Amino acid sequence: MVNDTIADMITRIRNANLITQKQVAVIASNTNKGIAQCLLKEGFIESIEYNTNSSNNPELILSLKYQGKKRKPYITALQRVSKSGLRVYTSYKDIPKVLGGIGIAILSTSQGILTDKQARMQKIGGEILCYIW
């Protein structure tokens, strides 16, 4: 049993990128679905499938994106920010820009899981879950 499903998801995506795997299966939770939707909207992954055929745990199947003949991953790095032992909260004014705006920060807000750009536009702060670039 995994205690931190977000960290598990980030690790699975990172490992799949290292071996240029086309798809990766992650645990299906509402938070992971929200993060996957943000990745899809920002163009870091190709598609999301919901798989309930596995034993008792439903899974999300993420199709990863690569560019060129050398299959360079669109996701260069993923970093977990807020952890179970140390939560990181921010107001909308203090949301950091990841690599000067090249990357994204994913936040858990009262309006759901949002990217840093969406949270700034809606003027909503929240818990910073991870950085992706």
Curated annotation (Swiss-Prot):
Q: Where does it localize? A: Plastid, Chloroplast
Instruction: Provide GO CC annotations from the record.
Output: chloroplast; ribonucleoprotein complex; ribosome
Q: Name one Pfam family in it.
A: Ribosomal_S8
Q: Which domain of life is it from?
A: Eukaryota
A GO molecular function assigned to this protein is:
rRNA binding
- What PROSITE patterns does the database record attribute to this sequence? RIBOSOMAL_S8
Q: Which family does it belong to?
A: Belongs to the universal ribosomal protein uS8 family.
Per the UniProt entry, what are the Gene Ontology biological process annotations, in alphabetical order?
Answer: translation
Functional description taken from the UniProt entry? One of the primary rRNA binding proteins, it binds directly to 16S rRNA central domain where it helps coordinate assembly of the platform of the 30S subunit.
Complex formation: Part of the 30S ribosomal subunit.
- Name assigned to this protein: Small ribosomal subunit protein uS8c
The organism of origin for this protein? Mesostigma viride
Q: Which UniProt keywords apply?
A: Chloroplast, Plastid, Ribonucleoprotein, Ribosomal protein, RNA-binding, rRNA-binding
Q: Which InterPro entries match?
A: Ribosomal_uS8, Ribosomal_uS8_CS, Ribosomal_uS8_sf
Q: Which SUPFAM superfamilies match?
A: Ribosomal protein S8
